């Protein structure tokens, strides 16, 4: 068996340690691999903090959260946040435009609309609304589902927390239970709608669940720009809302080597972010997502963009292309 200190070290380093300790001396050969790894981690931590400092609330627009913050009642904010996260795919400005259109069709605000909602009445109000794959019919079904939930449980937070287990590492299991519960509420209607399941992905299916994790970020985190509506879920349990754009950036700065954007990648990246902030690992998400939303980290490398980017000291692309 290997000594615990030798695990995951290159053979040359492990052999050097064995030879030194076997010669009857307490002197240890310096582990350059560990030193290098610590140096990289230090650079990345500095880069992430610089990135967070570069983007404050003034960089929020265009973002679906802008629309949510237009409501003042926490009950409206919770429902608006849920719908806004579900439809947070595609062009950011179009998302914001379509969300404002959607909420303008909800008399009395999102909470009042949903709690009074029935499939037929909801469908009438929402006729003609569409966002890419989804139409007003999908919103009507989801409103009916939420109506069942809110009448019985009072809030989405209470339903979500039923699946939260003591000692959980993250929200994964609770999110699975939450999605399963919602899918069951209007099962027949859900199964009839071709793209409805796209609105409610689950970690159990391997999905990264970017939009649901985004919803959780908004309602759980108490720091700007998020809402902090929920008080029974710890920010330390949140998982990074991972899409292809954020995943690409995470690869470039060494947070993952995985190729598939799925739940495993989201958990891995979150775990590494915990090294820099165990209590609030996804506080970096807002700033990371600005790079994609605002076009500050395009697919095509641009020396002017790269040299100004706070992440360049940790970016593999920046180093490999000799831009440093």
Q: Which residues are covered by each model-predicted region?
A:
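Arg/Lys-rich RNA-binding interfaces used to dock onto structured RNA substrates
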Residues: 11
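Residue-identity detector for glycine
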Residues: 22-24
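HhH-family (HhH-GPD) DNA N-glycosylase catalytic core used in base-excision repair
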Residues: 2, 14-17, 27-324
